[in-house]
Amino acid sequence: MDKDIGSAVAELQVCSTHYAMTIVSCGFHSPQSLMNADLQHCLLADQNYLLNNSNKNKGSIIEENTRKPFQSARNLQTSLKTHPESAITRYGLGYAGFGNGWTALKPKILFPSQKRRVKGRFTFPFSRRSNLAQSKLPVDLVPIRLEIDADRYKLRDSFTWNLYDKCISLDQFAEQICIDYDIPLHNVHIVQNISKSIQAQINDYEPRKAQSNLSFVSDVSSSTSETVYAHEPSDSLAKASKQQIPTVQNDLRILIKLDITIGRLNLIDQFEWNLFAPESSAEEFATVMCLDLGLSGEFCTAVAHSIREQCQMYIKYLSLIGYLFDGSEIEDEEVRSYILPPLKNTLRFSDMESSSFAPMIYELNDAEMERQDRGYDREARRMRRRQGRAKHGIMLPDLRDIPKIHRSLFPSSSVPSDDDFMHALSLSTNSDGETLNEINTNNPEREHLIVRLKVDSQKLKIIVEQSQTLTLNNFQQRKLTPLPNSMSFDSLNEFESERNTPSTYGQNISPLPQFSSPSLSSDAFLTNSNSSESALVHMQKLNLPDFTPSWVKRCVIETFAKFPNDRFNVIVKPALNPAERMTVRICCHDCINEYFTAGPGFTFGNFHIHLLSSSHQQKKEVRMNTVLDRNT
């Protein structure tokens, strides 16, 4: 647009010049003096008009330039929504998502029948007719606790089961549990134990079943604030008589105690709960509580299960002793001591301590988790052996034993655990007196990041030589005597040359010496002062072949210096292929027929783990005691 205005101004100037030349050609002697003032005024007015018009059009030009990319972006977004396959042609195959599925799709409802099936698993189909029939039945949740110990499997779980569930049988549910926990289905006894345990707990819930069909109907009366029970018809009680139950007072409070451990978190709390409050819902209370405390959904289900389980204990106890739930006084002294007295005031300050009724969350370490796990197993066995108090031939539940909930998270195959095996292995090779199984896994997080760099071969050799020099200096700081020239630590180039030398397999190799039981006088017990000298002596006694790599000699000396009372032999077998690494194995004299391959890397770390094991320590003590008895 600016170019058009400039060209128009230039044309006006050309026109004015042409007009002036025309006047000159007509015979006028001074064109500028003869220029008409009106013509100049018109030319200036036209020029100002064009300039003002250009300033007004700048805003429209900017708006037009902004609208074009915005409109193209909107068109691209619309095309991606309507035709997702066009994203592949525009952005490449990476936009398809591969295992994550398609992106930028319209949201849609995914029904269970449309879910992607996991390989090797199956689900039980539910028809619409069965779902419609199930929706018309009432919901009565039974707290279920599984404690299954079979073969090498230990299953502990807690959940709620709908008493009127008609969609799936207990056997099918038990099979689905085994599938979810990767328990092979050929273990039929585990499936049977799960279904029998659930069925037994449902049968124990029968006394509560009659009371679960009672609902509260408020008596709209200004004179009384009492509540009336009304009987609701259901499938199971359709033939029962619909007799009216007398009015009762809605105040039967108990003390709920929570002790829930999930993973590393332990929740401890206690609060009062009314057994027959019409607005009390264990699930809603657990949801609000976990939201306030910032806990996960696993705690939500555990809190609701614990509330229902403890309420069921009191309901079962009262039903078995013949209590009619008619608001009368409870005659049994034991259960009366657990029932809280009626409330007289809404606010209480004197009879209630806020510290004892406040939730507490503890984070457990590995030792505390293991100790709590053992205590939970011991308590579970004790509760199975213990029988409740019998009264009139009826076994009553023990209200003193409040069941705890202890859930250990199921290990995931995709999410790695916190333990690093290589880190534990490095700790085991550097620790004195700890085996690989005894390493404390509660180590602080490492602040270093492993970065892989591309280094030249020459630079890599220099780096390796420098690291070997550092190891040599650290080794000499242990007050070891200097090694002979024949046993000096060579560089990595020497090891490469030794590895590339032709194989000497089949040639005359010096036989390995046969060691007998060391006597007391022949350094059976070494002290720190002569440990370096004895390491060299043992090194010479091994009589290693000439083609033994230098790192093997170094590891032998380090092992003898670190474990002076242990006896072992090193077997070096050359490789048939010169490009391969020769085989180095270590034979322990105390443990018969036990051979260990050198490693990891150019170390004897695997053999050091064996020397630190308790079984080897016991055999070594037996040998040393035998030597002592023989010399005395």
UniProtKB/Swiss-Prot annotation:
GO MF annotation terms: transcription coregulator activity
Gene Ontology CC annotations of this record: chromatin; nuclear chromosome; nucleus; RSC-type complex; SWI/SNF complex
Keywords for the protein's UniProt record, in alphabetical order: Chromatin regulator, Nucleus, Transcription, Transcription regulation
Gene name for this UniProt entry: snf5
GO-annotated biological processes: chromatin remodeling; regulation of transcription by RNA polymerase II; transcription initiation-coupled chromatin remodeling
Assembly and oligomerization: Component of the SWI/SNF global transcription activator complex composed of at least arp9, arp42, snf5, snf22, snf30, sbf59, sol1, ssr1, ssr2, ssr3, ssr4 and tfg3.
Entry function: Component of the SWI/SNF complex, an ATP-dependent chromatin remodeling complex, required for the positive and negative regulation of gene expression of a large number of genes. It changes chromatin structure by altering DNA-histone contacts within a nucleosome, leading eventually to a change in nucleosome position, thus facilitating or repressing binding of gene-specific transcription factors.
Phosphoprotein in keyword set: no
Keyword Nucleotidyltransferase: no
Native source organism of the sequence: Schizosaccharomyces pombe (strain 972 / ATCC 24843)
Family in the record: Belongs to the SNF5 family.
Domain of life of the source: Eukaryota
Pfam families with a match to the protein in the record: SNF5
Subcellular location: Nucleus
Main location as per UniProt: nucleus
Protein's name according to its UniProt entry: SWI/SNF chromatin-remodeling complex subunit snf5
